[in-house]
UniProtKB/Swiss-Prot annotation:
Species this chain originates from: Staphylococcus haemolyticus (strain JCSC1435)
Membrane topology: Peripheral membrane protein
Protein name per UniProt: ATP synthase subunit delta
Gene Ontology MF annotations: proton-transporting ATP synthase activity, rotational mechanism
Superkingdom to which the source organism belongs: Bacteria
Family to which the UniProt record says this protein belongs: Belongs to the ATPase delta chain family.
Subunit structure: F-type ATPases have 2 components, F(1) - the catalytic core - and F(0) - the membrane proton channel. F(1) has five subunits: alpha(3), beta(3), gamma(1), delta(1), epsilon(1). F(0) has three main subunits: a(1), b(2) and c(10-14). The alpha and beta chains form an alternating ring which encloses part of the gamma chain. F(1) is attached to F(0) by a central stalk formed by the gamma and epsilon chains, while a peripheral stalk is formed by the delta and b chains.
Protein's gene: atpH
Pfam families: OSCP
Length: 179
């Protein structure tokens, strides 16, 4: 289903670029995703109910998402027709990835043993920007006591590991090679 979500996201992204409404589309799709994120099972039930015709699913979309811009509402109607309403959050995730790539931005998860100060986060942000050549990075922090000390950064598929745990694991591997 991720491939299906990617196709919807790419189509919506292309329309948003073509109509010069990328930021508006991002904001509205973000709101729709946020509003539906806790209703996945309900959307799945709507999609899978064989007794609910497409006209009722479209009516539901019109009532719930009536204020959405024309292009977003059109995509939501297509989702209703194709019984893919459950994909809304996956579509936003894919759209966000395209949006970030377009703006040379990405999200990063910074793990540390303790809550990092703003100054530490700024230094880590600068490091991430230098290592990745991104123009902007959005940081989410996570406390991970298993690191023992230092920090670990995940940006997409890249991991920058400056943790004490990693250092200890490297020392352990060296000792094993010697023995």
């Amino acid at each position: 289903m991720a491939n299906v979500a990617n196709k919807y996201a790419k189509a919506l992204f292309d329309v948003a670029i073509d109509k010069d409404r990328l930021d508006l589309m991002y904001d509205e799709l973000s709101e729709v995703s946020e509003a539906t994120k806790n209703y996945g099972e309900d959307l799945r039930a709507i999609d899978s109910n064989p007794n609910q015709p497409a006209s009722e699913r479209r009516k539901f979309v019109g009532i719930v998402f009536g204020d959405a811009n024309y292009y977003l509402k059109n995509m939501l109607m297509i989702l209703a027709n194709n019984r893919h309403l459950v994909l809304i959050n996956s579509i936003f995730k894919e759209f966000k990835s395209l949006y970030n790539e377009y703006h040379n931005e990405d999200s990063a998860i910074v793990e540390s043993v303790y809550q990092l100060s703003d100054e530490e986060l700024d230094r880590i942000k600068d490091l991430i920007l230098k290592q990745t050549n991104l123009s902007q990075v959005h940081i989410t922090t996570k406390i991970n006591p298993e690191l023992i000390g230092g920090f670990r950064v995940k940006v997409g598929t890249t991991v920058l590991d400056g943790s004490v745990k990693k250092d200890l694991e490297q020392i352990e591997r060296k000792f094993r090679r010697v023995n």
